[in-house]
């Protein structure tokens, strides 16, 4: 009598078991997040590892494990766990960015870093850090013209994002596009006042031997950041010596 119902019974038991496995996995993951937020990384790592024991395809837990390994200096451990997450979910943005950071910083391979950052960009085009990372990596490869639009895009997302100004200023200076640099920074300064934008704009004016323009940037910069203003003034003073 039970034979016709046996396949259904097996399915129900399997489904029940699978759901039972998911519940402790989610609980361990949640406790891992709590430990992480309280900077208890050893306890967090234990919790996340228990989560993936109960749920082998827990991509978020693998990413958290990878992040902890990277933070503790275990680069290979981080790499391995990011790869596990991407094997489950190839479009997992955080894992793609994590891989990009490894190949940008810990295991320098800029071509590989660009592959992962560009993949991350396809899944999330609103992340300023990804655009910044692309600008940084292109600058590191001395591909300065390619770096410029990525730095600009990062600033379109967050006009006060200072790391992007650093890459933008470096790329413009390396290509000697000083007039273009000034025009772009004028646009940024029209959106919001940012000290580093005045600084790089002032440097560009000195490169064009435009002392008046450089001094204007210096006066504005002095109002908001005296230390940066002093650095710019040193550059301007050298122009005066050369006159």
Per-range role (PLM):
Residues 1-25:
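Bacterial Sec-dependent N-terminal signal peptides
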Residues 17-54, 59, 243:
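N-terminal leader/linker segments that initiate helical-solenoid repeat arrays
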Residues 38-47, 72-84, 106-119, 140-153, ...:
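Structural signature of tandem alpha-helical TPR/SEL1-like repeats
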Residues 24, 192, 199-243:
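Terminal, low-structured helical/coil segments at or just beyond the last alpha-helical repeat
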Residues 30, 64, 98, 133, ...:
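Canonical tetratricopeptide repeat
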Residues 29, 36-37, 63, 69-70, ...:
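Position-specific recognition of the canonical hydrophobic site in helix A of tetratricopeptide repeat
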Residues 24-26, 59-60, 93-94, 128-129, ...:
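Helix-start (N-cap) detector for alpha-helical repeat units in TPR-like alpha-solenoids
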Residues 54, 88, 123, 157, ...:
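Structural marker of alpha-solenoid helical repeat scaffolds
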């Amino acid at each position: 009598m039970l034979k016709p119902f046996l396949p259904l019974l097996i399915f129900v038991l399997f489904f029940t078991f699978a759901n039972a496995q998911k519940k402790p996995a989610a609980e361990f993951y949640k406790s891992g997040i709590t430990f992480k937020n309280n900077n208890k990384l050893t306890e967090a790592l234990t919790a996340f590892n228990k989560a993936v024991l109960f749920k082998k395809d827990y991509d978020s837990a693998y990413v958290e494990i990878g992040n902890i390994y990277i933070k503790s200096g275990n680069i290979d451990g981080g790499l391995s766990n990011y790869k596990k997450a991407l094997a489950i979910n190839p479009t997992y943005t955080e894992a793609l960015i994590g891989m990009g950071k490894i190949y940008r910083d810990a295991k320098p391979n800029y071509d590989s870093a660009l592959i992962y950052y560009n993949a991350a960009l396809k899944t999330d085009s609103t992340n300023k850090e990804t655009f910044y990372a692309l600008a940084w990596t292109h600058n590191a490869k001395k591909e300065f013209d390619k770096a410029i639009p990525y730095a600009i895009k990062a600033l379109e997302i967050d006009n006060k994002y200072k790391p992007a100004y650093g890459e933008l200023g470096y790329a413009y200076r390396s290509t000697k596009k000083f007039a273009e640099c000034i025009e772009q920074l004028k646009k940024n300064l029209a959106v919001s006042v940012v000290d580093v934008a005045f600084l790089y704009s002032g440097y560009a004016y000195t490169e064009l031997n435009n002392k008046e323009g450089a001094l204007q940037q210096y006066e504005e910069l002095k109002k908001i950041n005296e230390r940066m203003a002093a650095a710019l003034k040193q550059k301007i003073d050298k122009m005066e010596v050369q006159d």
